């Protein structure tokens, strides 16, 4: 069992129940899924770029990503309908908790000039999104084998009813929010 999953079930549920003033433990917010998205607009020009991006995302997530394709042609961006423009992967269960553990303990502290995560990135329903400018913050990525620095979006979907519950959940997991 993943370390954070065990920690959530044994300690955080009881702590959050009293902290949020909930009656039932089933009301306690939990993390449903984590979605990683990497936009690769240059893949329209060179197919190798998409391969490198897929390999990076596979190493980070531990699971094969899905290629996202453009929905319509846009002349200004020089893309056509159906061309590959990105990759995404959705993590659930143990893989999700293992990724969250690596994100909190290793990747976020390795971000250059890091001053804390913005608490304004909640969507109003308790879900949190953050962007990372460099994929090399993750230990799975070998710096010498990286062709170019790419960023990725991380969306954490929770069962929280509002932003306050979502913030309390992520803070309990150890997310370093700005004060």
From Swiss-Prot:
It comes from the Bacteria. GO terms for molecular function: rRNA binding; structural constituent of ribosome; tRNA binding. InterPro entries: Ribosomal_uL5 (IPR002132), Ribosomal_uL5_bac-type (IPR020930), Ribosomal_uL5_C (IPR031309), Ribosomal_uL5_CS (IPR020929), Ribosomal_uL5_dom_sf (IPR022803), Ribosomal_uL5_N (IPR031310). SUPFAM superfamilies: RL5-like (SSF55282). PROSITE patterns: RIBOSOMAL_L5. One of its GO terms (biological process) is translation. The keyword Plastid does not apply. Keywords: Ribonucleoprotein, Ribosomal protein, RNA-binding, rRNA-binding, tRNA-binding. Pfam families: Ribosomal_L5, Ribosomal_L5_C. Gene3D superfamilies: 3.30.1440.10. The keyword tRNA-binding applies. GO terms for cellular component: ribonucleoprotein complex; ribosome. This is one of the proteins that bind and probably mediate the attachment of the 5S RNA into the large ribosomal subunit, where it forms part of the central protuberance. In the 70S ribosome it contacts protein S13 of the 30S subunit (bridge B1b), connecting the 2 subunits; this bridge is implicated in subunit movement. Contacts the P site tRNA; the 5S rRNA and some of its associated proteins might help stabilize positioning of ribosome-bound tRNAs. Part of the 50S ribosomal subunit; part of the 5S rRNA/L5/L18/L25 subcomplex. Contacts the 5S rRNA and the P site tRNA. Forms a bridge to the 30S subunit in the 70S ribosome. Belongs to the universal ribosomal protein uL5 family. This is Large ribosomal subunit protein uL5.
